[in-house]
Amino acid sequence: MSRFFANGSDSESESSEEEVQAPNFNKASAFQFSDDEEEVKRVVRSTKEKRYENLTSIIKTIRNHKKIKDIPNTLSSFEDLTRAYTKALPVISKEENGITPRFYIRCLAELEDFINEIWEDREGRRNLSKNNTKSLGTLRQKVRKYIKDFEEDLSRFREAPDQESEAEDEEAHVSDAGEAADDSYAGFKKEASVTAPKIAKSAPAKSVPADDEDSDDSIDWDSDSESETESSEDENQYQNMRERFLKRSTEKGEDKGDDDKRKDKRKEQKLKIRKRAEDDEDGEWETVVKGHVVEKPKMFEKDAEIDIPLVLAKLVEIMSARGKKRTDRRLQIDLLFELRDISDQHNLGVPVSVKIHFNIISAIFDYNQKISEPMKMEHWALLLEVMQSMMKLLLANADISISESVAEEHEEYITAPFYIRGCPLAAVERLDDEFTKLLKECDPHSNDYVSRLKDEMNVVKTIELVLQYFEQCGNPNERCRIYLRKIEHLYYKFDPEVLKKKRGEVPATTATSVDVMDKLCKFIYAKDDTDRIRTRAILAHIYHHAMHDNWFQARDLVLMSHLQDNIDAADPATRILYNRMMANLGLCAFRQENVKDAHHCLVDLMVTGKPKELLAQGLLPQRQHERSAEQEKIEKQRQMPFHMHINLELLECVYLVSAMLLEIPYIAAHEFDARRRMISKTFYQQLRSSERQSLVGPPESMREHVVAAAKAMRCGNWQACANFIVNKKMNTKVWDLFYESDRVREMLVKFIKEESLRTYLFTYSNVYTSISIPSLAQMYELPVPKVHSIISKMIINEELMASLDDPSETVVMHRSEPSRLQALAMQFVDKVTNLVDVNEKVFDMKQGNFFQRGNMGNRGDRGYNRNQNNQGGNWGGQRRDNRNQRNRNQRGHHKNQQQQQQQQVQTIDEE
């Protein structure tokens, strides 16, 4: 009988004999409405119920498609399932504490088994249609990629596939499973739909009562019968069309009855499961797990004699599957560990153990097929342990030599000296790279990053072990490579003992990181044959010197190495290290009061506007076609870990303050110079953009503070300038990041006073006839000798036209430079002259070469230009030349007058 009819159905045999007709319902009754419609209450479902119901409905659809092997629809349903699970993730993380529901894991496991079963059946695959074959390949790839995130849950599920938590049974997932099973059992007593549990006997065969089978059938319904039963229930539940679309009434009596039924059924199921468990305690019966059980391959025969050749042969057999398709890499690692344990149990020697250790390391590296992705944490911890264990064995046994130059046929494991093929240096380099990838993968502001960063101690310890081994038996090239790895973990770390040693607070024999860097780098300078290792060692050495305020040593290394000449030909990683070195060198120069050198070091980084990219500390958003996806992926791989970053705001502030201390006095000295050059283009743009604003509020950002300080310095107001640069907000953002920040702030205030004094003298020198040095010292709170030194230097460099009168301690200003009105008039004359020149050139272009021809357009034979002697030719150029000569004469005369006045002033001073 069809399951779509309203009445219940008998067994299949009875339905085949008797034909039951579908009842004819009155069409009018299907649309009848009652007055009780207002009493029907709406059912409010939670988000969890909605999401889980969506997931279970898609899972049922997938099961139906699997039954008929409809692979294209299975693929589309699987994509819907992944999207639905993504939507349900917030609910799962909130309600289930991030634990994936078991019914979802069961669906993934069943889908994986279904795909593997079809894929292994080659004959069946040949008979599939083209569409099914294509969909099968796509589905297999997507499922294999998707279930990587659920490997642990799947492995736990496959260990105990029939055990399900009570909470999932009772609350969310299969609360109606018992009803569906009972209804389907009552409606469809088909032998094909009932799957009795398979029971394997460990004792002689024992007859099972029929009642037990029937009772177990109601529990162990297959998912197929569940889906059919539930669909038939939905059809038979509604007697007309109206009831189907009405919201379910929530009467207390019905709900209470349903709850009681469900509780009774759950109790019955628990009793049956408990009874089965008690029967299993006798040890005679064993429940067979559904699905194909993969047996672990046997390592050796039972009576085999374990010796070195046998273990090595087994090792070669295990490693021969390396890199092949469908190789179980997890099983391969487990087999290698088991082989190592067998080797240790039979005392086959340290060389065999070292060889197995090295192959375990290779197998762990091979587990992650994508090089750009980091390895799993369980494999990372295992890798560190195995690597350190192998290096300890090598250091404890000096007669073992492991090198990649040893051929496999020349390996020796029995008699000393022992020779093994392998390269621990390559392994530790790969280990270091994996550590960097792990750091890049973590959120730098999370606790995971801190916990991962703690592993650096183990990584450095492993590098130290490899370094000790190669110092005993390695060649210079290998030692240079391992030295560079240690340098790269050391060069960016600040050691306060260095500065204490400079001040004499610790004994002079105290070993510091600077001493270690000197030792490692000098060995590389002497022994390295490759330019790359030497270049990176020099850059790291300069960086370390600059970090510890060894300014002159760092500067001399830069100048002697000539790195700035050929750094453009280096690889991207080396160029990034060069940029980092220049940034840190600029900070060092600033701390050592070399403002001009600090500006020169930082200008190349900051003028581009992309210091973040140049230092490999992040990517700036680009336009659509400026950077492809592949380029972006490569640049992300080059990024530096977060703990090695240089503070960009600190870098920009140091650059802008240095530019301010250089640019503001220069602007004041060349105020009326039309051809004035810019020292810092970035700072000049910031200053000009601020001046264009009609209303400027109080400064908030770091840039606004520097611009406000620059405006105060232009007026000679050093106190306002210092308050803008050194205040609570700027201390928190910038200056407190320096080691010995108080000394840096004192240095800044001192420089601001000196440069404000220079700016004041440049700006107001034409106002004063003479000015007292003590009054200047009092105004800028500087010692009198310091003010005297600054003014003397300005006079010597011909920046200030004045002379010092020592008896009276005054500065006598010379009126050699034009007044403000004269300077503006001269600027006006120059601009008008340029404007006239441009206009005359435009006029010449419009007229063409008519007046430049001697015969006025070849019409001289007609008498038009007779007796003119070419007087009209090039008349505009002649007039321009005459005017320019006249202007030059006027300027020369004015200059002569100035020189005469200056000579007269000098004569008066001498008298």
Curated annotation (Swiss-Prot):
Subcellular localization: Cytoplasm
Biased segments, Acidic residues type: 11-20, 162-171, 210-236
Modified residues (Phosphoserine): S34, S165, S175, S184
Keywords, sorted A to Z: Cytoplasm, Initiation factor, Phosphoprotein, Protein biosynthesis
GO terms for biological process, alphabetical: formation of cytoplasmic translation initiation complex
Region annotated Disordered, chain positions: 1-38, 155-181, 196-284, 851-911
Main localization (coarse): cytoplasm
GO molecular function, one term: RNA binding
Entries under InterPro entries matching the protein: EIF3C (IPR027516), EIF3C_N_dom (IPR008905), PCI_dom (IPR000717), WH_DNA-bd_sf (IPR036390)
Low complexity compositional bias, start-end: 196-208, 897-911
Comp. bias intervals (Polar residues): 23-32
Pfam families from the UniProt entry: eIF-3c_N (PF05470), PCI (PF01399)
Domain PCI: 642-818
A GO CC annotation given for this chain: eukaryotic translation initiation factor 3 complex
Record's compositionally biased regions (Basic and acidic residues): 241-271
Biased amino acid composition, Basic residues: 885-896
UniProt function note: Component of the eukaryotic translation initiation factor 3 (eIF-3) complex, which is involved in protein synthesis of a specialized repertoire of mRNAs and, together with other initiation factors, stimulates binding of mRNA and methionyl-tRNAi to the 40S ribosome. The eIF-3 complex specifically targets and initiates translation of a subset of mRNAs involved in cell proliferation.
Family to which this protein belongs: Belongs to the eIF-3 subunit C family.
PANTHER family, sorted: EUKARYOTIC TRANSLATION INITATION FACTOR 3, SUBUNIT 8 EIF3S8 -RELATED (PTHR13937), EUKARYOTIC TRANSLATION INITIATION FACTOR 3 SUBUNIT C-RELATED (PTHR13937:SF0)
Subunit structure: Component of the eukaryotic translation initiation factor 3 (eIF-3) complex. The eIF-3 complex interacts with pix.
Protein name: Eukaryotic translation initiation factor 3 subunit C
Organism for this UniProt entry: Drosophila persimilis
Lineage: Eukaryota, Metazoa, Ecdysozoa, Arthropoda, Hexapoda
Gene: eIF3c
